[in-house]
């Protein structure tokens, strides 16, 4: 008796997982396009002591580093540049 609802729930879950997402409304994409370019930030954490090239660049073990489109904010300082998805970002540690 319990197997039928359980089977139906599994079937529904499977169909929902395979279904294509609904297209976004046009007004959502227009407001996104009207706004200024978003600031993309990629957070990178270095925890290995073996990465000597990163330590020479100032990114010591356990230090949190980010790649951002803006200038580095306190307590971070600029150590170079990052390349992510064919865009150049500021590398801050």
Swiss-Prot record:
Kindly list the biological process annotations in GO that this record carries: antibacterial humoral response; antimicrobial humoral immune response mediated by antimicrobial peptide; cellular response to lipopolysaccharide; defense response to fungus; defense response to Gram-negative bacterium; defense response to Gram-positive bacterium; defense response to virus; disruption of plasma membrane integrity in another organism
Q: Which cysteines are joined by disulfide bonds?
A: 65-93, 67-82, 72-92
Q: Tell me where in or outside the cell this protein is found.
A: Secreted
Name the source's superkingdom.
Eukaryota
Propeptide feature ranges: 20-62
Query: Which keywords label this protein?
Result: Antibiotic, Antimicrobial, Antiviral defense, Defensin, Disulfide bond, Fungicide, Secreted, Signal
Q: What GO terms fall under cellular component here?
A: extracellular matrix; extracellular space
Note the InterPro entries from the entry: Alpha-defensin, Alpha-defensin_C, Alpha-defensin_N, Beta/alpha-defensin_C
SMART domains cross-referenced by the UniProt entry: Defensin_propep (SM01418), DEFSN (SM00048)
PROSITE patterns attached to this UniProt entry: DEFENSIN
Signal peptide range: 1-19
In the record, the note on similarity to other proteins reads:
Belongs to the alpha-defensin family.
Q: What does this protein do?
A: Has antibiotic, anti-fungi and antiviral activity.
Q: What is the name listed in the Swiss-Prot or TrEMBL entry for this protein? A: Neutrophil cationic peptide 2
Q: Which organism is it from?
A: Cavia porcellus
């Amino acid at each position: 008796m319990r197997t039928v609802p359980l089977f139906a729930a599994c079937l529904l879950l499977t169909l929902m997982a395979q279904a294509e997402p609904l297209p976004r409304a046009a007004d959502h994409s227009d407001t996104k396009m009207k706004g200024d370019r978003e600031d993309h930030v990629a957070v990178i954490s270095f925890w290995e002591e073996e990465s000597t090239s990163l330590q020479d660049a100032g990114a010591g073990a356990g230090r949190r580093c980010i790649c951002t489109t803006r200038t580095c904010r306190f307590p971070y300082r600029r150590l170079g540049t990052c390349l992510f998805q064919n865009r150049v970002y500021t590398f801050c540690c």
